[in-house]
Swiss-Prot record:
Signal peptide: none annotated. Keywords: Actin-binding, Calcium, Cell membrane, Coiled coil, Cytoplasm, Cytoskeleton, Endocytosis, Endosome, Membrane, Metal-binding, Repeat. InterPro entries: EF-hand-dom_pair, EF_Hand_1_Ca_BS, EF_hand_dom, EH_dom, End3. This is Actin cytoskeleton-regulatory complex protein END3. Its main location: membrane. It holds the Pfam family End3. Ca(2+) binds at residues 53, 55, 57, 59, 64. Component of the PAN1 actin cytoskeleton-regulatory complex. It is a peripheral membrane protein. The lineage of its organism: Eukaryota, Fungi, Dikarya, Ascomycota, Saccharomycotina. Belongs to the END3 family. The gene is END3. Disulfide bonds: none annotated. One of its GO terms (cellular component) is actin cytoskeleton-regulatory complex.
Length: 381
């Protein structure tokens, strides 16, 4: 079959826009008239929808809508005699290829080590989001061994790791990936990889995969405003407690020759510099310093000894530290605003590009219309 041509995509864009999409997506109700007009059988239309709705959100974005229209036209025009069982590679949008691969991994019946039915009855609900320094070092080793030159990791690049997990079914691997990748990108960054591996680690040790992630993580993964509630339980990491559980991905680390590179060390926050996480951390440190300063001030009021000079000096040092942290937080806020402006500029450039495309299309249609009018006038003459 021929690939999608530019003129064909422009035609689908006209139809898509005419159906009044909301947030760049069409619901089933809005697409239904187009589907019914094809006069295909209901089971055929249901199969087309299933193939087109790649991210399974019950809606169609423009790429998914193009798939729907092409499958319908191929059936109506006799190019195809049956709905394909799966999308041909030429019809899969590059931005969604990773979703197809993830879904196929869940459905396939390969002989890999993680292919078995999930025993939900034996799982516990005490999932712990805290990442210990040792676990973090393990996750970073795996990340460094699989990330590309841009620091990104694809779902399929960790296939060897998945096969080494004896207690994690494929469906849970896919669920964990979707949790850290709510925007359904083809690749994920370091923060997302570390949390993804942590979820797999917890599942390997008998913890049920959670239905969602903490607000602060969700904001980071979705590039939204993080949760700054310092009293939130999610904002306070739980202390590491020895559970006697086995080390994560030992066999996999041995396989890639990285088993001896993991050592116990303190938590390294350098990777969060310039991110939303750094701002959360600075706010937390500011609160701790303010509380400590408040205690010192109260202590001075109740202390009748001759240690006022020492207390005054200590108070001055903490005030200077507090001022430094406040300045650093202000710098982090400015950096965040600058990043937001960059994203807005990118959106504007994209919109401008779309407008230019539509203007070119309008000009071509206007030219065609003018030619038709000239032919009509010549015939009348």
């Amino acid at each position: 079959m021929p690939r999608l041509e530019d003129w064909e995509i422009k035609k689908y864009w006209e139809i898509f826009q005419g159906l009044d999409p909301v947030n760049k997506k069409l619901t089933g109700d809005k697409v239904a008239p187009v589907l019914k007009n094809s006069r295909l059988q209901d089971d055929q239309l249901a199969k087309i929808w299933e193939l087109s709705d790649i991210d399974s959100d019950g809606k169609l974005d423009f790429e998914e809508f193009c798939i729907t229209m092409r499958l319908i036209f191929d059936m109506v025009n006799g190019v195809s005699t049956a709905i394909p069982k799966e999308l041909p590679s030429w019809l899969i949008p590059s931005s969604k290829a990773h979703l197809i691969q993830a879904n196929n991994a869940v459905r396939s019946n390969s002989n890999q080590g993680f292919d078995y039915e999930d025993d939900e009855d034996g799982l516990s609900d005490d999932f712990d989001w805290y990442i210990s320094p040792t676990d973090k070092a393990t996750y970073e080793t795996i990340y460094n061994s699989n990330s590309d030159s841009y620091g990104r990791v694809k779902f399929e690049s960790l296939n060897s790791l998945y096969s080494s997990l004896s207690k994690v079914p494929k469906s849970d691997i896919s669920s964990a990936w979707n949790l850290v990748n709510p925007k359904s990108f083809e690749t994920i960054d370091k923060d997302q990889v570390l949390v993804f591996l942590h979820i797999l680690n917890q599942r390997e040790n008998g913890k049920r995969i959670p239905r969602g992630v903490p607000a602060s993580l969700r904001a980071t993964f979705s590039k939204e405003v993080p949760n700054y509630d310092l009293n939130s339980v999610q904002a306070k990491p739980q202390p590491s407690v020895g559970t006697g559980r086995k080390s994560f991905a030992n066999d996999y680390l041995n396989k890639i020759g990285q088993a001896n590179t993991i050592t116990e060390r303190g938590t390294d926050f350098s990777s969060t510099e310039g991110t939303d996480w750094e701002e959360v951390r600075l706010r937390r440190e500011l609160t701790d310093l303010e509380n400590l300063l408040h205690k010192i001030q109260n202590g001075n009021k109740n202390d009748n000894s001759n240690t006022n000079d020492d207390s005054a000096l200590l108070k001055y040092e903490y005030e200077q530290l507090l001022k430094y942290k406040q300045n650093k937080l202000s710098s982090a806020n400015l950096s965040t605003k600058s990043k937001d402006l960059t994203e807005v500029k990118g959106d504007l450039d994209l919109i401008q590009s779309q407008v230019s495309t539509l203007e070119d299309f309008l000009k071509s249609k206007s030219s065609e219309l003018e030619k038709l009018n000239e032919e009509i006038r010549s015939l009348k003459a």
